[in-house]
Amino acid sequence: MEIWQKAVDLAVKFHRIAERLDQRRLYRYAEQLRAAGLSISNNVAEGSGSAHKQEFIQFLNITRRSLFEDASMLLVFEKLGLLESAEVDELLWDCDEESRKITNFSRKL
């Protein structure tokens, strides 16, 4: 499933950023980013096992909310000088693209 694969790719990117935050001893930031990043792919996977279409759509909505949570954290980290603008811009683009794909996928269910 394309949206799941993209979600996994995003989770890996967020995990790598979290590792850099850990090196700066920003453990809470790192853990929050990891959790929200993993939530994206986990909710797509869990929702795909739903017996009912509406339940799957609910999981996809949770997935989108996790994307927005990650995007918010990225913007805060940028403002704090923890991430470069170019990296944040690229990740925000990825989040937006994934959000649109999830929305389109949900509508087709």
Language-model features: locations:
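Amphipathic alpha-helical assembly/interaction segments
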Residues: M1-L109
